[in-house]
């Protein structure tokens, strides 16, 4: 008799040409992810060849009950690390039956910005550092922390090793490999300053692909924590007190910044970002005011400062960039629960399209 694990790992390619496509979309909170699967007659590699689909938006907080149908438009395809074979994950965005993007569809506007000829010509690159916290399921307390208590002070946990310093590495490494299998441009992982908190990086990726990849990487991570019986949190300040929050630092460059003389282009871009600081803060994640306090490697959200190698700044420029006179900069303001479609497109819009 087959066990459940045998059936979960069943290789369908031995017996059928049909494949499973898992359609993924952003739910009603703008942060939660939803998915459902359908059978296709054969392998598909081009998202334009995939059928549109619908779902009950009244059950996700995205449509009223009397007119509940929301339409999914397939946008990008990734290999499915759970079902494997020719099975796929499909990142979608959501529209009304009339073809209008619903309010939580932030991809639609981002695609407009990234298709602007001025933006296309500059080939914007993004590298996003996604921090997250793993919580014990029944008590909503970080993994590795004593129930009702606290671990030792921060210091030994960042990039730490050992059973008393690194908690949840099996989840982290499983996620790393699953993203590589899926075709996501994941570039690394590390343990973070607060115990039970980790980070993965996506990029450098061009334009809207950075946000597509980050959303699917988040999806894969939550599926893995589901299997492990652990809760995934993107709260920007999951534990109050003398503990680091969780961000999504966004590294950015354009072709002009990467070419000779790019440091001057970077400084002009930072000046633009300073002038729109309030607008960016408002769009950079819910609850970010609990994180951006001027402590724990953050700048106060009410002030804008930038500097070279300054992790207490709003915008950090690396020493390598300063020395080379070209390169990239890091926007340290986005919270861990930010929408990458919003953040990446807003940075491009402010630095490339906005005229002060």
UniProtKB/Swiss-Prot annotation:
Main location: cytoplasm
Keywords: ATP-binding, Cytoplasm, Ligase, Nitrogen fixation, Nucleotide-binding
Compartment list: Cytoplasm
EC number, as in UniProt: 6.3.1.2
Catalytic activity reported: L-glutamate + NH4(+) + ATP = L-glutamine + ADP + phosphate + H(+)
Domain GS beta-grasp residue range list: 19-99
GO biological process annotation, one example: glutamine biosynthetic process
Top-level taxon in the UniProt lineage: Eukaryota
Entries under SMART domains matching the protein: Gln-synt_C (SM01230)
Residue ranges of the TM segments: none
Domain GS catalytic per the UniProt entry, residue ranges: 106-356
Tissue: This is a nodule isozyme.
One Pfam assignment: Gln-synt_N
GO MF annotation terms: ATP binding; glutamine synthetase activity
GO CC terms: cytoplasm
UniProt-listed InterPro entries: Gln_synt_N (IPR008147), Gln_synt_N_sf (IPR036651), Gln_synth/guanido_kin_cat_dom (IPR014746), Gln_synth_cat_dom (IPR008146), Gln_synth_gly_rich_site (IPR027303), Gln_synth_N_conserv_site (IPR027302), Glutamine_Synthetase (IPR050292)
The keyword Thylakoid is assigned to this record: no
Other facts: There are at least four isozymes of this enzyme in P.vulgaris. Irreversibly inhibited by the herbicide L-phosphinothricin (PPT).
Assembly behavior: Homooctamer.
Similarity comment: family membership: Belongs to the glutamine synthetase family.
Name of protein: Glutamine synthetase N-1
High-level lineage: Eukaryota, Viridiplantae, Streptophyta, Embryophyta, Tracheophyta
Encoding gene per record: Gln-gamma
């Amino acid at each position: 008799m087959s066990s459940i694990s045998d059936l979960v790992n069943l290789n369908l390619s031995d017996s059928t040409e049909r494949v499973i496509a898992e359609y993924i979309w952003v739910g009603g909170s703008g942060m939660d992810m939803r998915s459902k699967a359908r059978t296709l007659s054969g392998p598909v590699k081009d998202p334009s060849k995939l059928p549109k689909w619908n779902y009950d938006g009244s059950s996700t907080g995205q449509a009223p009950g009397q007119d509940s149908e929301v339409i999914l438009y397939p946008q990008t395809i990734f290999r499915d690390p759970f079902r494997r074979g020719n099975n796929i994950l499909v990142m979608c965005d959501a529209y009304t039956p009339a073809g209008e993007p619903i309010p939580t569809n932030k991809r639609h506007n981002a695609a407009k910005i990234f298709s602007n000829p001025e933006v296309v010509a500059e080939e914007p690159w993004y590298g996003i550092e996604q921090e997250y916290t793993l919580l014990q399921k029944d008590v909503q307390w970080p993994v590795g922390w004593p129930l009702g208590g606290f671990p030792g002070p921060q210091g030994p946990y960042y990039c730490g090793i050992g059973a008393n310093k690194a908690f949840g590495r099996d989840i982290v490494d499983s996620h790393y490999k699953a993203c590589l299998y899926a075709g996501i441009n994941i570039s690394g992982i590390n343990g973070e300053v607060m115990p039970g908190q980790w980070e993965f990086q996506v990029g450098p990726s061009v334009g809207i692909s950075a946000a597509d990849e980050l959303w699917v990487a988040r999806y894969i991570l939550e599926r893995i924590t589901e299997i492990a019986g652990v809760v995934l949190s993107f709260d920007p300040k999951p534990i109050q007190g003398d503990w680091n929050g969780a961000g999504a630092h966004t590294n950015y460059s354009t072709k002009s910044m990467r070419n000779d003389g790019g440091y001057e282009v970077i400084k002009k871009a930072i000046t633009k970002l300073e002038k729109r600081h309030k607008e960016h803060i408002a769009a950079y994640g819910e609850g970010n005011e609990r994180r951006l306090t001027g402590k724990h490697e953050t700048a106060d959200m009410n002030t804008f400062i930038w500097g070279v190698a300054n992790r207490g700044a709003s915008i950090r420029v690396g020493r390598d960039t300063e020395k080379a006179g070209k390169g990239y900069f890091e926007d340290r303001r986005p919270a861990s629960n930010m929408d990458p479609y919003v953040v990446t497109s807003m940075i491009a819009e402010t630095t490339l399209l906005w005229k002060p």
